[in-house]
């Protein structure tokens, strides 16, 4: 029988049909090649938005800089970055007036954080620009390299382990006449292989010392490396994102801590909370506006979009905000917070890898590095690239472009939210002094504006006033991309509101399925995703049960672990059948060993090993949870692991799942090819770093959640801990006298070696 699909929706309220409009199946687009073109676009656009500002020259680096602050007021609707200092300061003052003590309290909270934060905070985060090697590295390695170079240049404050002391070193490093850096390089030579008698390329890794004068060092310290943002859906063009170096990161962290503390106290801020907490917070603002408008007023909501939010923001404005927010605070605190915006006012954008050229006729490919863009003949480029390069050339120094205005993506999300909320705050009647008033929600560059007024003319006037106020603070509401509706229907940060937030379950679809980490983690993540969607996204019991069955099926196909009594033939079926036959209690076998699935929607919160433990044969338990099993390279597993989930839209989310360490929690070995490249030295450093940390955590089992504070080195701490533990164990009879003497001897030897060094 034919079914008319519209019949499916007869009984469904319109807002519940949102999941059927889902366009994002399949993989998101990834970028290939270099991001140089996108970065040049960003730099050129940012300067265009501020073109009527004042040009100055940085005295230290010689970089030309454009300052649009307090520039001409806009006369048209084009996006512009001419924020007015006095307007920003006034908006801050009114924000404080409406929330007495907010800045004071946030400063006190932040001061406490500043004094307690350890330098290992900076090891969080993925790729970081490593100024010592002039390219991207994992954050931990970049930090280790920076500290190593600092110490070899006589900067020792960082040894205390406090972030604030590391930042003192950063400040001092900028005053030094020169800095000496050790870089890795690789030599290639052709040699004849003794066995095959063929010529092969042999690579050797060397380290060389390089001196950077003050100017070169400053340029590197102020450099943001750029990459292309991957996996962005719904965009035709890619765009560039920035990754700052270690000198900037610590200062940014403290500014964002202060801003986060302020955002937590602002009801219109969509940051730093997320998920259901965010929905509740936002629903409150909407409720307030609707309750007040029932009798005499009408209420409209704008689903807002700002044009090029961060390219029109300005670090000088952020400096003004911080100066105001911290005005009654101690000098040292004000200084440390003002450094991040000052560094951003003098930032340099690294243009990435450069351009790739290929000659079809000669089958040649060659890369033009970014450093050459400044003086290469433009006849090799097409028109659009030529225009870009001509525009950017005056700004280039050593392959980086001077970029004073603009913020680059994702740098000061919290602080820019505070700026946005300060405008929403001005919508109260006591400030508009007329019949219309507004309120709304702000989360980084995304906003929703709710305007109330007695009639349509009032609504229009309110929107116009909001639009112009934004212009004064360097925020450009896009008239083309924002749309207005009766209050009750709008979208904000991919949450759709229709008389309440609508669960858009389809957004989560990409995170269903098998993640491909290992059998143990994948099972756990799979059921956790289903559980979370039942809690947060209106995933009903019947659908959840179906999702679970589909997941188990998918899982069995991925790992070729169909039930032991199935007819499906795979390359694992021989072993799995054999295990099935010799197992007494078949219900105790894990799904990944060909066992049955015992999950249903009531027990999704229990890890599979725990669920089946009582049902397992004893020898199976022994094999499954045996840390000495020689066939498994084990990593030590915390009881809770983090998986990164990619929803269809919006930022990647961290999801916790329970991890029980079994022989299925294997870790794939690192790809061998890296060992032949210039990365090898770095890899060895990284492993060394890892080993030291692991050893340290063996001595101080609690160190994973609380770093020891003090001035003794790691080695001293471990030696003294070993002595104390040994004495306690000896006195309580846990170890023999010979062992005790042996331990003491080793400790003395270590100390002796340290003294000699």
UniProtKB/Swiss-Prot annotation:
GO terms for molecular function: nucleotide binding; RNA binding; RNA-directed RNA polymerase activity. Its EC number is 2.7.7.48. GO terms for biological process: DNA-templated transcription; symbiont-mediated suppression of host gene expression; symbiont-mediated suppression of host mRNA transcription via inhibition of RNA polymerase II activity; viral RNA genome replication; viral transcription. Residues 286-483 form the RdRp catalytic domain. A motif (Nuclear localization signal) lies at residues 187-195, 203-216. It catalyses: RNA(n) + a ribonucleoside 5'-triphosphate = RNA(n+1) + diphosphate. Gene3D superfamilies: 6.10.140.720. Pfam families: Flu_PB1. InterPro entries: RNA-dir_pol_NSvirus, RNA_pol_PB1_influenza. It comes from the Viruses. It is an enzyme of class 2 (transferase). Keywords: Eukaryotic host gene expression shutoff by virus, Eukaryotic host transcription shutoff by virus, Host cytoplasm, Host gene expression shutoff by virus, Host nucleus, Host-virus interaction, Inhibition of host RNA polymerase II by virus, Nucleotide-binding, Nucleotidyltransferase, Phosphoprotein, RNA-directed RNA polymerase, Transferase, Viral RNA replication, Viral transcription. PROSITE patterns: RDRP_SSRNA_NEG_SEG. It is found in: Host nucleus; Host cytoplasm. Phosphorylated by host PRKCA. Belongs to the influenza viruses polymerase PB1 family. Influenza RNA polymerase is composed of three subunits: PB1, PB2 and PA. Interacts (via N-terminus) with PA (via C-terminus). Interacts (via C-terminus) with PB2 (via N-terminus); this interaction is essential for transcription initiation. Interacts (via C-terminus) with human PKP2 (via N-terminus); the interaction competitively inhibits the interaction between the RNA polymerase subunits PB1 and PB2. RNA-dependent RNA polymerase which is responsible for replication and transcription of virus RNA segments. The transcription of viral mRNAs occurs by a unique mechanism called cap-snatching. 5' methylated caps of cellular mRNAs are cleaved after 10-13 nucleotides by PA. In turn, these short capped RNAs are used as primers by PB1 for transcription of viral mRNAs. During virus replication, PB1 initiates RNA synthesis and copy vRNA into complementary RNA (cRNA) which in turn serves as a template for the production of more vRNAs. This is RNA-directed RNA polymerase catalytic subunit. It comes from Influenza A virus (strain A/USA:Albany/12/1951 H1N1).
């Amino acid at each position: 029988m034919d079914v008319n699909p519209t019949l499916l929706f007869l009984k469904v309220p319109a807002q519940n049909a949102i999941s059927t409009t889902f366009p994002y199946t399949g993989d998101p687009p990834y970028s290939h090649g270099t991001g140089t073109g996108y970065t040049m676009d960003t730099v050129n656009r940012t300067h265009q938005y501020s073109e009527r500002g004042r040009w100055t020259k940085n005295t230290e680096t010689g970089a030309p800089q454009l300052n649009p602050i307090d520039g001409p007021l806009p006369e048209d609707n084009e996006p512009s970055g001419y924020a007015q200092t006095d307007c920003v300061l006034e908006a801050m003052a009114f924000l404080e007036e409406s929330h007495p003590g907010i800045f004071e309290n946030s400063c006190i909270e932040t001061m406490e954080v500043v004094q307690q934060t350890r330098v290992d905070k900076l090891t969080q985060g993925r790729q970081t620009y490593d100024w010592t090697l002039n390219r991207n590295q994992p954050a931990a390695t970049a930090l280790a390299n920076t500290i190593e170079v600092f110490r070899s240049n006589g900067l020792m404050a960082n040894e205390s382990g406090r972030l604030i002391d590391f930042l003192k070193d950063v400040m001092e490093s900028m005053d030094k006449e020169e800095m000496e850096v050790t870089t890795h390089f690789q030599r290639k030579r052709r040699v004849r292989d003794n066995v095959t008698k063929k010529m092969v390329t042999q690579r050797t890794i060397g380290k060389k010392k390089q001196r950077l004068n003050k100017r070169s060092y400053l340029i590197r310290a102020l450099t943001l490396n750029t990459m292309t943002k991957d996996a962005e859906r719904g965009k035709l063009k890619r765009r560039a994102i920035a990754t700052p170096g270690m000198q900037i990161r610590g200062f940014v962290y403290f500014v964002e801590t202060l801003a986060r503390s302020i955002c937590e106290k602002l009801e219109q801020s969509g940051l730093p909370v997320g998920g259901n907490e965010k929905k509740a917070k936002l629903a409150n603002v909407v409720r307030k506006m609707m309750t007040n408008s029932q009798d005499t007023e009408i209420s409209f909501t704008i689903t807002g979009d700002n044009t090029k939010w961060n390219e029109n923001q300005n670090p000088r404005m952020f400096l003004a905000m911080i100066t105001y927010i911290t005005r009654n605070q101690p000098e040292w605190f004000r200084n440390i917070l003002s450094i991040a915006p000052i560094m951003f006012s003098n930032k340099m954008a690294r243009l990435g890898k450069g351009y790739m050229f290929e000659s079809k006729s000669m089958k040649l490919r060659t890369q033009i590095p970014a450093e050459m863009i400044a003086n290469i003949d433009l006849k090799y480029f097409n028109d659009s690239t030529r225009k870009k390069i001509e525009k950017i050339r005056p700004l280039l120094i050593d392959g980086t472009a001077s970029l004073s205005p603009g913020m680059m993506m994702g740098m000061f999300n919290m602080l820019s939210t505070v700026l946005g909320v300060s405008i929403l705050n001005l919508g109260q009647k006591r400030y508009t002094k007329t019949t219309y008033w507004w309120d709304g929600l702000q989360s980084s560059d995304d906003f929703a504006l709710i305007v109330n007024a007695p009639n349509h003319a009032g609504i229009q006037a309110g929107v116009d006033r909001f639009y112009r106020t934004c212009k004064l603070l360097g925020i450009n509401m896009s008239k083309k991309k924002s749309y207005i509706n009766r209050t009750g229907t709008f979208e904000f940060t991919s949450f759709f509101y229709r008389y309440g937030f609508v669960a858009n379950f389809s957004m989560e679809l990409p995170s269903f399925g098998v993640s491909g980490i290992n059998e143990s983690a994948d099972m756990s993540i799979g059921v956790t995703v289903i559980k979370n969607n039942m809690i947060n996204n209106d995933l009903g019991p019947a659908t959840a049960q179906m999702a679970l069955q589909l997941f188990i099926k998918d899982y069995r196909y991925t790992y070729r672990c169909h039930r032991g009594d199935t007819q499906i033939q795979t390359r694992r079926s021989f072993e799995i059948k054999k295990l099935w036959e010799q197992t007494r209690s078949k219900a105790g076998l894990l799904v990944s060993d060909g066992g049955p699935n015992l999950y249903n929607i009531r027990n999704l919160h229990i890890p599979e090993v725990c669920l089946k433990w009582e049902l397992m044969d004893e020898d199976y338990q022994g094999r499954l949870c045996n840390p000495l099993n020689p066939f498994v390279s084990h990593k030590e597993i915390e009881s809770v692991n983090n998986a990164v989930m990619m929803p269809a839209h919006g930022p990647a989310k961290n999801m916790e799942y329970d991890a029980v360490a079994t022989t299925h929690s294997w870790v794939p070995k690192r790809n061998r090819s890296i060992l032949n490249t210039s990365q090898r030295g770095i890899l060895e450093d990284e492993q060394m770093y890892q080993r030291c940390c692991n050893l340290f955590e063996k001595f101080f089992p609690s160190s994973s959640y609380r770093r020891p504070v003090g001035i003794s080195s790691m080695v001293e701490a471990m030696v003294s801990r070993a002595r104390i533990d040994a004495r306690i164990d000896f006195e309580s009879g846990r170890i023999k006298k010979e062992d005790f003497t042996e331990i003491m001897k080793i400790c003395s030897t270590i100390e002796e070696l340290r003294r000699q060094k």
